[in-house]
C-alpha cells in the first residue's frame, strides 16, 4: 500500500513496517540535496513531528513523521550521497523505515490518484 501526505512525504507499507521518503515533487522543489539528517533507530515518532531534515543549496526542509511509530532502520546511503534522493526519491532515495503504531491509520492518507490531484 502506497500513501502520501499533504507535506509531500510518501509511505509504502510492508506488513507493519512503512518505508518513508519525500515525493518527486518535493525533491524537484528543493533542488540538489547536499545534506540529509535522519532520525535515530529506535526513535519514537509522533505524527506531524519533524523526523528528518533535507538540505539543498536553496533551503533546508523538515521531513515530518507521517504517522506514529518507531524508527526501525535508516538509509545510510542517502546520508553519504544525498543526491540519491534527487535521483530516485521514491526508490533508492527512501529515508527511513518505521514500525507503525496503527497500520490502519494509513487509510486516512492520500492514495496515488488523490495525491496527483492535490494542489502543489
UniProtKB/Swiss-Prot annotation:
Pfam families: GCV_H (PF01597). InterPro entries: 2-oxoA_DH_lipoyl-BS, Biotin_lipoyl, GCV_H, GCV_H/Fam206, GCV_H_sub, Single_hybrid_motif. One of its GO terms (cellular component) is cytoplasm. Transmembrane segments: none annotated. Keywords: Lipoyl. PROSITE patterns: BIOTINYL_LIPOYL (PS50968), LIPOYL (PS00189). SUPFAM superfamilies: Single hybrid motif (SSF51230). The modification N6-lipoyllysine is found at residue 58. GO terms for biological process: glycine decarboxylation via glycine cleavage system. The keyword Amino-acid biosynthesis does not apply. Signal peptide: none annotated. Its cofactor is (R)-lipoate. The keyword Cell cycle does not apply. Residues 17-99 form the Lipoyl-binding domain. Binds 1 lipoyl cofactor covalently. HAMAP family: GcvH (MF_00272). Belongs to the GcvH family. The glycine cleavage system catalyzes the degradation of glycine. The H protein shuttles the methylamine group of glycine from the P protein to the T protein. The glycine cleavage system is composed of four proteins: P, T, L and H. This is Glycine cleavage system H protein. It comes from Methylobacterium nodulans (strain LMG 21967 / CNCM I-2342 / ORS 2060).
Amino acid at each position: 500500500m502506497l500513501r502520501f501526505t499533504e507535506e509531500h512525504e510518501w509511505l509504502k507499507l510492508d506488513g507493519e513496517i512503512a518505508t518513508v521518503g519525500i515525493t518527486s515533487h518535493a525533491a524537484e522543489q528543493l533542488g540538489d540535496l547536499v545534506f540529509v539528517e535522519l532520525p535515530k533507530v529506535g526513535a519514537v515518532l509522533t505524527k506531524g513531528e519533524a523526523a528528518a531534515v533535507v538540505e539543498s543549496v536553496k533551503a533546508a526542509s523538515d521531513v515530518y513523521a507521517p504517522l506514529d511509530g518507531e524508527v526501525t532502520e535508516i538509509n545510510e546511503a542517502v546520508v553519504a550521497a544525498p543526491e540519491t534522493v534527487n535521483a530516485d526519491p521514491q526508490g533508492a532515495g527512501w529515508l527511513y523505515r518505521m514500525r507503525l503504531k496503527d497500520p490502519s491509520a494509513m487509510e486516512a492518507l492520500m492514495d496515488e490518484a488523490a495525491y496527483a490531484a492535490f494542489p502543489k
